[in-house]
Amino acid sequence: MSQRTIFIAAAALMFAATAWAHHNMSAIYDFNDRITMTGTLSKMDWRNPHIELIVDTKNGTEVQSWALEGPSPSFFRARDINRSDVEAALNKTVTADASRARDGSRAGLLRTMTLPDGKVISACPQNC
């Protein structure tokens, strides 16, 4: 085998491993450990490869910020959910259901979110 062939094969394997690790959500989030939170949607990052939402909840007098990761914007667009739907909820109360991060941080994989107008958005390809 030539050095060029070995190099190409090694590069392909490295790329495949990186892509697999990035999309292996079960390694990052525990699908059996769910949390439901009600709080203020304080930030939204609506871009590829995954949207990110920050929900500020209260624990007594302490505010806890939760980082919730969701699918790509195109996932939501295909389900008739637009950036403007979520932007309208900024600085308002939302209820979110998420799978917790395995590392114990205040992070989760978004499953569903109820917007202030009562619209429920699902971040699951099928039933959550």
Predicted regions: what they are:
Residues 1-8:
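Bacterial N-terminal signal peptides that target proteins for export
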Residues 99-126:
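OB-fold/S1-family single-stranded nucleic acid-binding modules
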Residues 47-58:
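Short aromatic-glycine-enriched beta-strand elements
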Residues 78-96:
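Short nucleic-acid-contacting surface segments enriched for D/E, G, S/T with interspersed K/R
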Residues 39-41:
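Conserved hydrophobic positions within beta-strands
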Residues 19-35:
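Short boundary/loop segments of OB/S1/cold-shock single-stranded nucleic-acid-binding domains
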Residues 62-75:
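Short, basic/aromatic beta-hairpin or loop at an interaction surface
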